[in-house]
Design a protein with these regions (language model features):
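Active-site neighborhood of phospho(di)ester-bond hydrolases with catalytic His/Asp-centered motifs
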Residues: 11-14, 34-42, 62-65, 119-123, ...
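Conserved beta-strand hairpin/beta-sheet module of binuclear metal-dependent hydrolase folds
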Residues: 1-27, 107-123, 140
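Active-site environment of divalent metal-dependent phosphoester hydrolases
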Residues: 43-47, 69-70, 104, 127-129, ...
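A short helix->loop->beta-strand "cap" motif at the edges of active sites that frequently abuts
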Residues: 7, 57-60, 186-190
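Metallo-beta-lactamase
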Residues: 63-116
Length: 206
């Protein structure tokens, strides 16, 4: 959830309508308070709840241009708009960061209202050029910290899945996220939310 004076944006909707509504109630919001949905990529855990959401509360849906039609088909939305750099929704400017993930197109986003700036970057298998510069102007960031490498290697996942997660097109490890945060020391970032933590290969304590 990204909020400004004039907008309430959801970044991805992977949960069903009931679970999404329950989460929104924590912020005293309902489905009808959402201004738009912004999609990072086409994997089902990120778009699986969009169809149910828009059937209850029709809102604009935005996705990377390369996958706008694909998202519309998979999420059974009537229309999905392509999002480019410097796209504006209400009072928010949206800039993109291209992630390294095994999707047709996958982006992190930075949202700015002219005074404050927040960003979310998940589902990227490696730290590509420009990530630190993309995050540095933000007041708050949400960054992937998916797995502990040793837990993943010794865990129950089948080898092909382990290889996918550990690849440059998988997910950021705790160590990779730590390096990004170390590089952000001295930047404008004041608050960090670690996201996309694996239930099987990570712990909050780590």
């Amino acid at each position: 959830l990204v909020q400004s004076d004039n907008a309430n944006l959801l970044v991805d909707v992977g949960l069903g309508c009931r679970a999404t509504l329950s989460a929104l109630k924590m912020y005293n919001l309902s489905l009808s308070d959402i201004t738009a949905i912004v999609v990072t990529h086409e994997h089902s855990d990120h778009i699986g709840g969009i169809s149910s959401f828009v059937s209850h509360s029709p809102v604009p849906v935005y996705a990377p241009k390369a996958i706008a039609n694909l998202v519309a088909k998979r999420a059974t939305c009537c229309d999905v708009s392509g999002i480019a750099d410097a796209t504006e929704i209400a009072d928010l400017r949206i800039d993109r960061y291209e992630c390294s993930h095994d999707a047709t197109a996958c982006y992190g986003y930075r949202f700015s209202d002219g005074t404050n700036s927040v960003a979310t970057v998940t589902d990227t298998g490696c730290v590509t050029t420009g990530l630190v510069d993309f995050l540095a102007p933000c007041d708050r960031i949400q960054l992937e910290s998916n797995h502990d490498v040793d837990m993943l290697k010794s865990g129950p996942y089948p080898y092909p899945l382990k290889r996918r997660i550990l690849s440059d097109f998988g997910h950021l490890s705790n160590a990779q996220a730590t390096q990004v945060l170390s590089d952000l020391v001295g930047s404008n970032v004041k608050s960090v939310i670690l996201a996309h933590l694996s239930e099987h290969n990570n712990t909050a304590e780590l």
